[in-house]
């Protein structure tokens, strides 16, 4: 999705009270902040198989039910255990392996790694975004070598239509069979159903797919990303206990939780605390709503963004009136690596003691994107989130997406600072 066109559409449709459907964790979202979807959910704030210049990667490789790769490892045969008992699942962008070579992954910060994305088709088949099945084989092998579980993530941003068609009528049996085949023929340990946006009417199919996979492959791990919630709008979470009954992890996409919408002030991509009517999203407020809806804490995870959000002038900090400011860059367009190499300075860094996250502030537009305020996560905010996970008894964290956190020009041992922080603060 083209970043600026999506941003313009977000602003227009949000003003009209409609679901923009431009954003989410997955294929097709380049740089906008997460779009509000129906029911008050944020449709995720991350993910995309495009960069700010357009589509990357080669032709898609079709995944059906007849691959002849090696047998799958049972999910239970990989411990994945950590000192804290928490999980850490990072999403690896299949369309951009050059940005983060598998050989450079900091495995000590992960218990699970998800190959993103396999795209569902109306006939129940799937295509791997980027079209490189060997990449999946290599990632699975490397993960297992390091004691990390490998997950096939299905869907991504704007995948709702594909899921609905693949799970309709007689197609759902074929779709589920192909998912089982993906497990048994590649070595994946589980399936991640990244259905975005997921409306109330989609919930029965989400449950049906998991049940079919569990019946055929009882040892498979089942995970699902879920939306952050706008407290002004609320959300109908009555179906989530049934979803939690058939999924092992429900991970909140708690990044990209800001925008330049009517009625909003400038805000953070991933605020831990502090919500009001003009900044209506935080991790804590969302977690409380899911827990109140009887989602078990031990199955609930929170998200950490490996990218930031960039606002234009006159905004220079969080919780300011927009006064014409726009959100000019987000996922893919302003990765953590780009923030650290093109924007960061100790004098620009500030700390929001209420939201418990950092930000960069500039008095005038800062190249290359003209940012005057950048929200992002760093080692200190990850430590805060790790402490929160432990205090609340939550299951763990996810990261969108791993490729954006890699500092290729840093010295060896210093190229994955965010994963190192997760190792220290979440897993131990």
Regions found by a protein language model. Give the residues of each.
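Alpha-helical scaffolding within the catalytic cores
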Residues: 95-103, 132-139, 174-179, 231-240, ...
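Mobile, glycine-rich extracellular loop/lid and propeptide segments
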Residues: 155, 190-196
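Conserved, mostly hydrophobic/aromatic
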Residues: 113, 152, 193, 250, ...
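Bacterial N-terminal signal peptides
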Residues: 8-20
